[in-house]
Amino acid sequence: MLSINTVVLHADCRYRILEAPSQGYIWIDIDSDNAFPELIQAAVINQLFHDERLKLQDDPYGELVNEPVEQGSKHQYLRDERMKLIAPLITQEDVYFRSTRGKLIQKRCEETGTPKKTLYKLLRQYWQRGCVPNALLPDYRNAGGKGKKKVSTQKLGRPR
């Protein structure tokens, strides 16, 4: 049996197990920009494991769990604000299912004044990166070109 937050590889796609309800497992593709949780039957998972078409993988976001966040920093503030937005949603199991997710998100949008697109993005980021508060940290580590020289020798912008 798979545990919650396990990452598996199936058909060149990495999936994270989000929940294990009585019907089977709920998983999400962690590499897709527009993935949503899907329910997959436990019998199907067991058959895929038996046929060796489903393999365990290392968690690519495993370092986020223990990543230290400086107290009072902008990163901590953003993470906490994002967590406040989705906290009421992630406690409800109905948010995993397409038929009820839209209504829950619409209700939360009306409560907070946040666009639907933002809530969907934050939920997806939370689920794909390990269902921990640090999953909502900003991606500033991907910005810039560390170690690269600037291509231009002139300053950018309009000349004075």
What are the residue ranges of the model-derived segments?
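Secondary-structure boundary/capping micro-motif
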Residues: 1-160
